[in-house]
Amino acid sequence: MKKLVFLFLSLLTAGSLFQACDNSKTYAEMLEDEKNAVNKFIKDNDIRVISLEEFERDTITASKEAGNGYDEYVAFSNGVYMQIVDRGGKEDKNGVEVINEVDTFANNNVICTRYVEQDMMTGDTTCFNVPLERWMDVPDYYKFPLTFRYVQNTSTVYGIVLSGSLDYDLLWNSKGYGTAIPSGWLIALPYLRNNAHVRLIVPSKMGHTTAQ
C-alpha cells in the first residue's frame, strides 16, 4: 500500500574515521577505533544499554524526555544502537489524543524523513534537513525532507531515495550519499509508527557507502 508517512531521526556516526586519509591504519584498526568511540560516547553520556531480548519484552527504551532520568539504548548484533524517543502513531479524535496501534511502516510506503546526523568523533553536524540555528540563513538546507520508498518483502528490506522536484535534499545530494537508504536506518522501522522520533548510533558498515 502506498502511503505518505513521516519520521524524524537523530543520528550519530563515526564517519570521519573512514573518510580521513590515514594510510598508517588498517581497515580493521579503524573499525576498532570506531568501536572504542562508540563505547566512549555511551560511557560519557551515561547511557544504559539493553539487549534485543530485553527490549522486545515491551519494545520501550527509557529516555530523559519521557521523565525516566536516564537514556536507554537497545544494542543490535550489527552494531546499531537505538533509542525510541517517540514511537509515533498519535492521532486526535474529537480533541482526545489516541494511539493508532496499526499505523506502522509498511511495504511501498513513501517515508518523509527529517534528520540530523552528527559525527561522534568530532561533534560536527555532518548532514541535516531541519532548521538549525547556525544555518537558519540557508533555507535551502532544510527546504525539503528526504523522501524514500520503503520496500519490504520476505527476503529483503531496503529504501530507495526519491528524486522528484519536492524531494530534493540539498546536503544529502551534495555529499554524494546516493539513492540507497543506509541499512542502519531501516532496522528501526518495524518498531515505529507514523511521526516517530528515534535516535540511532550507526556504525560505518551500516551507514552510508561513503563511510564504509
Region locations from a protein language model:
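Sec-dependent N-terminal signal peptides
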Residues: 4-15
